[in-house]
A protein has these predicted regions:
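Feature for secretory/organellar precursors and membrane-associated catalytic proteins
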Residues: 23-24, 39-108, 113
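C-terminal regulatory/effector modules of DNA-binding transcriptional regulators
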Residues: 77-81, 85-166
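Short, positionally conserved secondary-structure boundary motifs
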Residues: 1-63, 134-166
Length: 166
């Protein structure tokens, strides 16, 4: 939607509204009643929406983070490896990294404890390319370094066990 000055609004689909969005994404009255905001420091063209994500499948983005997406009108504009907010008939709103296949799209979580899965292109209702995000959780690089160090130590332990068996 556009404000009285002709500036593009960004509608927010929060977790509460996300359940109704799958059925009302094209309902002007539903969209009109969503919370709206503008970001003067983001200069963009096109239609944008903000989605509050839930779950831990896209860590380090945490549940409650807001992803701003630009509407993508055609599958030809999708780029492998980029992240998108996708509205599907089956799963509703999902936020994933993608790989475009012939008749389907592979959805890939950044959190590797979740397996990738494919959806048919015919199941896709809307696609929004992620262009920015806001989070209430600030990154803690110390935790990331500890995580990497633990993985490396585990690999060394596994190598030592293999050497001892040989």
């Amino acid at each position: 939607t556009v404000d009285k000055f002709g500036e593009e609004n960004i509608e927010l689909i929060n977790q509460k509204a996300s359940a109704g969005y799958a059925n009302s994404y094209s309902d002007f009255e539903f969209i009109e009643n969503l919370p709206k905001f503008q970001l003067p420091f983001l200069h963009f063209t096109g239609t944008h929406r903000a989605f509050e994500i839930k779950g831990d499948s896209m860590l380090p983005l945490t549940s409650g983070s807001i992803v701003i997406g630009k509407f993508i009108e055609n599958f030809d504009f999708l780029k492998d490896g980029k992240t998108y907010v996708i509205l599907t008939k089956e799963d509703g709103i999902v936020y994933k990294r993608i790989e475009v296949l012939n008749n389907s799209i592979k959805l890939i979580s950044d959190n590797k404890t979740y397996d990738p899965y494919n959806i048919d292109k015919s199941d896709v209702i809307e696609i929004w390319e992620a262009i920015a995000f806001f989070s209430h959780d600030f990154p803690n690089p110390e935790n990331e370094y500890k995580n990497i160090k633990n993985h490396i130590n585990n690999l060394y332990s596994n190598l030592d066990e293999l050497k001892n068996k040989l």
